[in-house]
């Protein structure tokens, strides 16, 4: 069984086809401008001596502070997907006996300040998360990907040509 990563849960909320393709090792993201920008943001933080990425099990957490697990994103284009990604990370930490709150920092390209969202793994969110994880497992175990549904964000996706051309 595939271990569900932060990327997979993010893709599940963003696009079921993308989630299935990524989980089944059809990776076209090396050609994605957005993926490159995200990697550069992490590299810049590393160069400034702020290397804070932490690996726990099969997930990579951007940063942990005294009170928060922090996830950094370049834009707030899909905050719901990021929320569930952070809830997964909080759940993984809880399984290790570490209780934190989630903090999502969106670094907007053309704005002076960053947007910050907060999330907590309460009983309701944890129950929903476990249901989502079961649904993701069902999805990625399908023999073929679900049919792609065109959305506005598809044009910027690394899988656009695979799905629509």
Q: PLM features: residue spans?
A:
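Metal-dependent nuclease catalytic cores that hydrolyze phosphodiester bonds in DNA/RNA
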Residues: 1-69, 73-80, 84-87
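Cysteine-cluster motifs in flexible loop/terminal segments that predominantly coordinate metals
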Residues: 15-19, 143-165
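Short helix-capping/linker segments at secondary-structure and domain boundaries
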Residues: 20-28, 93-100, 165
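Short, charged low-complexity intrinsically disordered segments located at boundaries
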Residues: 39-43, 50-52, 118-124, 158-165
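Short, flexible, glycine/charge-rich loop motifs used to bind or transfer phosphoryl groups or to couple energy/partner
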Residues: 53, 60, 92, 144-147
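Nucleic-acid nuclease catalytic cores
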Residues: 56, 64-140, 161
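Broad gene-expression machinery/nucleic-acid interaction feature
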Residues: 60, 101, 154
């Amino acid at each position: 069984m595939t271990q569900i990563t932060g990327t997979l849960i993010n893709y599940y909320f963003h696009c079921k086809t993308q989630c299935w393709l990524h989980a089944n090792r059809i990776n076209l993201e090396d050609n994605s401008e957005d993926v490159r920008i995200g990697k550069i943001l992490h590299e810049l933080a590393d160069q400034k001596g702020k290397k804070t990425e932490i690996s726990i099990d099969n997930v990579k957490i951007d940063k942990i502070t005294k009170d928060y697990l922090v996830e950094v994103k370049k834009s707030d284009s899909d905050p719901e997907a990021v929320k569930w990604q952070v809830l997964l990370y909080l759940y993984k930490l809880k399984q290790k006996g570490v209780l934190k709150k989630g903090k999502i920092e969106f670094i907007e390209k053309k704005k002076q300040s960053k947007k910050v969202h907060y999330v907590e793994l309460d009983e309701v969110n944890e129950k929903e998360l476990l249901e989502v994880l079961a649904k993701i497992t069902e999805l990625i175990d399908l023999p073929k990907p679900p049919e792609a549904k065109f959305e506005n964000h598809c044009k910027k996706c690394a899988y656009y040509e695979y799905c629509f051309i």
